[in-house]
Swiss-Prot record:
It comes from Arabidopsis thaliana. Residues 35-81 form the F-box domain. Gene3D superfamilies: Kelch-type beta propeller (2.120.10.80). Keywords: Kelch repeat, Repeat. This is F-box/kelch-repeat protein At4g39590.
């Protein structure tokens, strides 16, 4: 082979084609997506989301838009809460003011404008019924029942010339609307009312001339009907007509406890009355602020919380409770309410400015060592301010499941 000349080498180099270069792939520019607004979600998805949120936030949600308000006030949301097992105990307060023919109703809600406990009582619609004095309030499920009392001339709010009533009014705590319920067989005022296994037992508050076989009536919310229970005859019959019997009741452990001239207990399963041997034990709770939480009876008296240990038939002091105000033990009275495994405590305090401050504490309960219960103060704060003429002592506090 002959050697290639420099000129030929140069020509060959110039004629040689470079290998094709790989083209760089263009990097796609990032796609900017608009954030999804919760308001753009369909109603059924919003309802499912809101049903999982505590009912205490519903007033704040209802202020966002008319659409949100429509969802959180719909019957469907409470049906969904029940299916999702998201029902909760909500606290209600009924206040009465001197020389005022109206009752004032409040429920505890979350307040986004507060920075401590973020909870406050908000007023809800009151019934458009004539004022009923000496009535009883009791809650079953999502309803609050106002039973009996006196009706008459509204210009005489102290109760003169007023007649006892068999009327029953029902507050639906899901919609905050009132309706009439089935009337009792007898007119009553200043009776005592307790709940046992979902049924309402109304005792006393009748005239001596009334049928004694109807002295105790029992209402079944499922069948919306009234029945009677055998009269245990625990009060003396006086010659004069007397409405205000010294009869008190407590529903506990599936039984109805009554105190009158003696202490008795009624077992609905057996359908009979028995004497209470340790009557003074139950008497402590009946005469004081009390409530039942997870089938355990609690009461408060003279600054001390106690619970009833049914295993040893003895009252024991509730331990812990650090965080309550220093002067709490000096309160004359307070209200105890079941909050579904926890306990709400309400008390009031008068200020020199002429204002009555209503406080609330939420206490979680824990069993320790088998025979002790400890309470932990989750929070406490002022939840309502009213005029000094109002007193929590004459108020009613209770909870409903919604």
């Amino acid at each position: 082979m002959f050697p290639m000349s420099s000129t030929s080498r140069s020509s060959a180099a110039n004629n040689r084609k470079d290998p094709p270069r790989k083209k760089n792939k263009e990097t796609p520019s990032p796609v900017t997506r608009e954030p999804t607004s919760i308001d753009s979600l369909p109603n059924d998805l919003l309802l499912n989301c809101f049903a999982r949120v505590s009912r205490m936030y519903y007033p704040a949600l209802s202020r966002v838009s008319k659409r949100f308000r429509s969802i959180v006030t719909s019957p469907e949301i409470y049906n969904t809460r029940s299916l999702l097992n998201r029902t909760e105990k909500c606290l209600y307060l009924c206040l009465r003011f001197p020389f005022d023919n109206n009752t004032h109703w409040f429920t505890l809600y979350q307040n986004p404008n507060r920075t401590v406990s973020d909870k406050v009582f908000l007023q809800i619609p009151s019934p458009q019924y004539p004022l009923t004095l000496s009535s009883n309030l009791v809650a079953v499920g999502s309803n609050i029942y106002r039973i009996g009392g006196t009706v008459g001339d509204d210009s005489c709010p102290l109760g003169f010339d007023r007649e006892p009533s068999s009327k029953v009014s029902i507050l639906d705590c899901r919609s905050h609307t009132w309706r009439d319920g089935p009337r009792m067989r007898l007119n009553r005022r200043s009776s005592t009312t307790s709940v046992v296994d979902g049924k309402i037992y109304v005792t006393g508050g009748t005239e001596d001339t009334d049928n004694p076989s109807h002295w105790i009536e029992v209402f079944d919310p499922k069948t919306q009907s009234w029945g009677t229970v055998t009269n245990p005859h625990i009060v003396k019959v006086w010659e004069e007509v007397c409405y205000r019997r010294a009869v008190k009741s407590i529903g506990h452990d599936g039984k109805l406890y009554l105190s009158g001239d003696k202490y008795v207990v009624y077992d609905p399963d057996e359908g009979k009355w028995n004497s209470v041997e340790e009557h003074w034990l139950i008497g402590y709770a009946i005469g004081s602020s009390n409530c039942v939480v997870d089938n355990i009876l609690f009461y408060w008296d003279q600054g001390v919380f106690k619970w009833y240990d049914s295993k040893v038939s003895s009252w024991k002091q509730l331990k812990g409770l650090e965080g309550l105000p220093d002067d709490f033990s000096q309160r004359e009275y307070c209200k105890l309410v079941d909050l579904g495994g926890k306990m709400a405590v309400l008390w009031d305090k008068w200020e020199y400015s002429g204002v009555c401050m209503i406080f609330c504490a939420e206490i979680s309960l824990e069993k320790r060592d088998g025979d002790e219960i400890w309470g932990k103060v989750e929070w406490f704060d002022t939840v309502l301010e009213v005029g000094a003429s109002c007193s929590l002592k004459s108020a009613d506090a209770l909870s409903a499941s919604v």
